């Protein structure tokens, strides 16, 4: 008896399943609905192509509908391409959607280059014909010409201008004895795990109004502040005298790496009036290197904002190191120095720190460790520091006094009018 019930149940389910696709309505009022009426692509660099974006097409009718035709209005000359219900085609005929069901259409855009320096618009539409009903979805993309750099070495003095963004694939390397000058307003965008390798000299001189940008090449809003999109800028042992002034370095694994002392009487790197943010590991990593940093903002790194080990020379004035993260679970101090590092020889460490704010969400945000028989010289004066140590008391330092950022959770590190740090800085020059 039980088998009979099971058999009847099976027949019922089979009958109901068949009914879903049974009958195709030809009613002219049976229209499709869409997840959006306009699909917008943010800046798409010419020749590189976009990611796929999805549109859902719904049949809200009880009966199935037959879509006579789905196609791109621009046909074969369109910048856009489609994947319709799993097939890479730009036109499909007689596609059936069961009642109360849907299909997916994926859209990609690849824009040919031209001679324009300003962004331009590429447009098309997807056309649907169902029971005589003509419906459409608008497709809009903002195209941008660019200079593409693919695993390139710069062997002579070169200047990059702001007329077009530079898109780096794999790497760009400045050879020893060569200088790369970057003018105000220039954008250098890195694809995937690419990097900039400086074996000569980098001179990036932006301005307040037109800073220079180093970032990933993903232009969608989701990636605007997403760490880990490229590998960062690396200054090698043959490099010296580089400058980063009014620059924004963001969304990398390690923003800046410098692996040795300068070979001249100038610092390895002079970093001024810049922002270093959104790093998977660290904002700056130095191995027995020399850094002059003046009036910079560091924030949102997975481990360290500044990590200087194996000795070195550090002159830090009027910087803000704000150890706040949203997605990255940091357990290390924002600023860390040591004369040693695993696998590298220990070396003397000279640290000059004045007028800095070193603050964050942890109890210990500043740590100096001497582990070897080296010389440690420090001048730590007139800073606001969050620390468990009493080592830095005196010398006009303010310990564990909240600086009063306007909104650190939203990464606004301007000081409130009531901040205890207002008018407390000494008049240090760069």
Model-derived regions, located:
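Positively charged n-region of N-terminal signal peptides that target proteins for export
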Residues: 1-5
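C-terminal motif of bacterial Sec signal peptides marking the signal peptidase cleavage site
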Residues: 14-17
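Hydrophobic helical h-region of N-terminal Sec-dependent signal peptides
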Residues: 8-12
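Beta-strand/loop edge motif enriched in small/polar residues
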Residues: 19-25, 32-43, 48-54, 91-430
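Short, solvent-exposed loop/linker segments at beta-strand-coil boundaries, enriched for Pro/Gly
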Residues: 73-91
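Short acidic/proline- and small/hydrophobic-mixed sequence motifs that coincide with surface turns
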Residues: 50-51, 62-67
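Asparagine-centered strand-capping/turn motif at beta-strand->loop junctions
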Residues: 57-61
């Amino acid at each position: 008896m039980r088998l009979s019930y099971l058999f009847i149940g099976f027949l019922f389910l089979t009958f109901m399943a068949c009914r879903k696709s049974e009958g195709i309505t030809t009613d002219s009022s049976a229209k499709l609905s869409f997840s959006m009426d306009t699909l917008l692509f943010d800046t798409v660099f010419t020749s590189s192509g976009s990611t796929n974006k999805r549109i859902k097409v719904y049949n809200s009718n009880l009966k199935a509908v037959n879509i006579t035709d789905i196609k791109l209005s621009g046909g074969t000359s369109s910048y856009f391409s489609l994947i319709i219900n799993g097939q890479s085609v730009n036109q499909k005929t007689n596609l059936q959607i069961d009642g109360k069901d849907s299909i997916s259409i994926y859209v990609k855009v690849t824009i040919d280059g031209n001679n324009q320096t300003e962004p331009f618009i590429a447009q098309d539409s997807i056309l649907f014909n169902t029971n005589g009903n003509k419906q459409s979805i608008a497709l809009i993309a903002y195209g941008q010409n660019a200079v593409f750099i693919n695993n390139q070495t710069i062997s002579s003095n070169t200047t990059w201008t702001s007329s077009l963004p530079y898109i780096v694939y794999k790497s760009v390397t400045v050879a020893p004895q060569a200088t790369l000058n970057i003018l105000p307003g220039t954008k250098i965008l890195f694809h995937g795990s690419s990097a900039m390798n400086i074996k000569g000299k980098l001179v990036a001189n932006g301005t307040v109004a037109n800073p220079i940008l180093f970032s990933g090449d993903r232009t969608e809003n989701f990636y605007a502040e997403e760490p880990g999109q490229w590998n960062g800028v690396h200054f090698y042992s043959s490099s010296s005298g580089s400058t980063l002034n009014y620059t924004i370095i963001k969304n990398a694994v390690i923003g800046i790496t410098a692996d040795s002392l300068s070979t001249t009487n100038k610092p390895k790197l002079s970093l001024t009036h810049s922002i270093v943010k959104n790093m998977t590991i660290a904002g700056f990593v130095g191995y027995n290197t020399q850094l002059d940093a003046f009036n910079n903002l560091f924030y949102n790194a997975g481990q360290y904002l500044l990590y200087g080990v194996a000795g070195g020379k550090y002159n830090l004035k009027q910087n803000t190191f704000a150890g706040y993260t949203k997605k990255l679970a940091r357990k290390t101090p924002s600023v860390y120095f040591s004369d040693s590092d695993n696998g590298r020889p220990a070396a003397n460490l000279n640290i000059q720190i004045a007028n800095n704010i070193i603050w964050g969400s942890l109890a210990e945000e500043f740590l100096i460790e001497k582990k070897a028989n080296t010389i440690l010289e420090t001048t730590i004066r007139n800073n606001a520091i969050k620390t468990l140590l009493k080592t830095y008391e005196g010398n006009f330092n303010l310990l564990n006094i909240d600086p009063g950022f306007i909104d650190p959770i939203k990464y606004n590190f301007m000081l409130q009018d009531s901040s205890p740090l207002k008018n407390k800085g000494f008049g240090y020059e760069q």
